[in-house]
Amino acid sequence: MELRLFLFNRFDDPLGELAWGGRLTHAEEIGGEDTLEFECPDAPAKGDRLLWRDPDSGAWREHVVVRTDEPLRGACRVYAESSLSEMLLDFIEMAQLVSRTAEQALAAALAPTRWEAGTVEDGFGKHGCMLYHTNALAALRRIEEVWGCEAEPIVEVSGNRVSRRSVSLAARRGGWRG
């Protein structure tokens, strides 16, 4: 499957397909970074969104351009992070999670965001923690830690654009790749 990058501006308006060349590197760490690095002839703007279908899993992925290195001559180097990074701007004043399920905790963490709760596997039990003066992404990472689960962003596409963004919780995502 040929990897195609579809470019959208920060307001989710389509800008077309982004031409890229050379090597594209996708690095993902569970509960950590999820980045995309590549070179292209024309630099996308900071905040633009890249939508692509993962050739390994067939799942749609979305990344946000956070930096471009533009030399005087040659290709532009693009660095993008998972669209979950937008949750860094969503603030949680306070959420007391006392004897809550993972599903209830996820709903609290996603409340100030445009993301929805996806599928939550059974078996995480009831736990508690305090989410106080934090961002939604830090809250999501705390939920992973306390409930012993792994979060997975799910991007659904219809009509050549993102139709839904959700976060699912699983006991374990994918396999070990080193």
Feature map (PLM): residue ranges:
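Juxtamembrane "anchor/assembly" segments of surface/extracellular structural proteins
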Residues: 1-46, 81-85
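Short, solvent-exposed secondary-structure boundary motifs
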Residues: 11-18, 53-60, 139-146
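Short beta-strand-centered interaction patches in the first periplasmic/extracellular domains
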Residues: 72-87, 119-178
